[in-house]
Amino acid sequence: MDKLTPKEASKGAEEILLTQIKQDFITPANAIFDYVDMVEKVLNDADLTSEDEIAQIKSSCNHLIEQYEVAFLQNTGINAETSKKTPEEYSELRHNLRTPLNAIIGYSEILMEDYEDDLEESALEDFQQIINLARETEKAIEVFVDYIRGESIDPNNDTSSNQLESA
């Protein structure tokens, strides 16, 4: 598939593209939960205190998925708002979706640093995987926002046309 804008895509192609955009977000976001559960078990088995940080990561991930679902419903398909948003509204949407990711990354980095001497390498790699998945989710957010802005996106490309640094 070549680069497409929402206006250029046929109805079927648009539905496929939207499914891919959503899947590219949901897959890494859900995988974060699995890795957090694994890390939590390792920390508990090692009698390392981390309940607050783990709870913050889980809460942020839940918040992220909920916000994305609302944004997806409001901005795609028959529910899409017909009026064009301002650049500030797109920036706010991008910011609101990325804020929970920053918490996920930040708390994961804190736990990695706090327990790097107490955990096996595999547990530290799990923390790094959480961070990598958060960055992958961040890229999916960029593609989603670019798409609803009407910008061309390449469904086969992992980066968006408007890639920003982490907020």
PLM-predicted stretches and their roles:
Residues 1-5:
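Interdomain "switch/hinge" adjacent to the Bergerat
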Residues 6, 10-20, 29-66, 78-88, ...:
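Histidine phosphotransfer helical core of two-component systems
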Residues 69, 142:
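A short, exposed helix-loop element centered on a Lys and neighboring polar residues
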